[in-house]
Amino acid sequence: MKLNHYISLVGLLIVTLAQAQHQINIDATLVPELRTITIEQELAYKNDSDSILHEIYLSDWANSFSSKTTPLAKRFSENYQGSFHFEKNKNRGHSNIVSINNNIKKPLVWSRGDEVDIIRVQLDKKLLPGEAYILKMEYHIILPDDKFTRYGITNSGDFKIRYWYLAPAVFDGGWNIYSNKDLNDSYLNPTNFNIKFHTPYNFNLISDLDLVSEITENKIKTTQLKGENRMQVKLQLLKNSDFKTIKTDKLLVSTNHTHLKITPPIQALIIDRIVHYLNKNLGDYPFDKMVLSEIDYKRNPVYGLNLLPEFISPFPNDFEYDIEMFKIISRTYLENTLAVNPREDHWIIGAFQVYLMMEYIKTYYPNMKLAGNLSNLWILGIFHASELEFNDQYSFLYMNMARNNLHQKNTTPKDYFLEFNKNIGSDYY
């Protein structure tokens, strides 16, 4: 099938500005010495279903770190990540809900289930189809160390946050609500955000939202951000920012993922080529800026490249950086524009990304071998693997997965995947 045939299917899923269903207004204050963000949030939840709603569910994933028995903690145990269970309570993090009120500040009844990162809010009146209901919420987020998920507080006192606000669950005849299991798969319908963030003056706020204003008074920096039709808001609050911005004629790309052996001008040219390639094959990216962090790559690296020690470099340096950035940029593009359930329909984004990567390799590196320059060594010439093209890795790994009885259906929810399939295998089916 031709690439544009695949992309026509993607086009059916890509969100448009008119589709934004909810409005979230946030006034947040960072208190570094207390590891805390205090938040006042207003949520205008629009019922776009045909059902009458009597309740609204919220994802409170900041509270998924609160004990050793949460679904997230159990996930860490399954993956043999014992550090979370032996960590001090103060370093795990949690949320503290002060109040949840209606539009006239009347308190509403709310509760948590056994999964402490899900909140059920009982409405004081019916929410009819097409109508909106306003929630006013006040709460505190105590942030965990970043060593558990790479998000949280770093050793240097920086704050890297992803699931830090109360997010409304998706209702499509039934509530799509589930707990945080460190899968980066929060499900939020396209939402408009207005955020005012107060930090000490020496912090730099990194975000892909539009910057409205930034002022500093009495050593407090207030940054106002705006974003339309967003499905996630990741922020980094850094004392010394290592992000560099590359300006292309399509969008701004801000990143701290780099390569020591590639000069900044070459890095910029590579990023520009990737952006133009995706623009040609996927259409315009709907936002003016894209932020790509080292966390994005560490959590979803190019399989194979991440396993090699630094002193072994079978691939050209520009190829390594090119394919790493292509994976980050294409993944970010798809995650920010495809309104799909990332836990149930995770395979959609994964499959499109693998296809795009294969086509990119065919276009710019048609002769690249799976073993890179090692394929030229005579000792490897006796092995079939030395003859494999770089793109052969996908079918090769799939067959290896099948032989080892690791295969699982693509329709399997992501939290039921084996670790190998969660990280690698499912995208290759």
PLM region spans:
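Extended, low-hydrophobicity, Ser/Thr/Pro/Gly-biased non-transmembrane segments
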Residues: 80-99, 111-117, 122-124, 135-234
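Juxtacatalytic substrate-recognition/specificity segment
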Residues: 195, 224, 242-346, 352-360
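N-terminal, polar/Ser/Thr-rich
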Residues: 18-38, 48-52, 155
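Bacterial Sec-dependent N-terminal signal peptides
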Residues: 1-23
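Coil residues (strongly favoring Ser/Thr
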Residues: 28, 51, 115-118, 250
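Ligand-binding face of N-terminal immunoglobulin V-set domains in extracellular IgSF glycoproteins
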Residues: 38-64, 69, 80
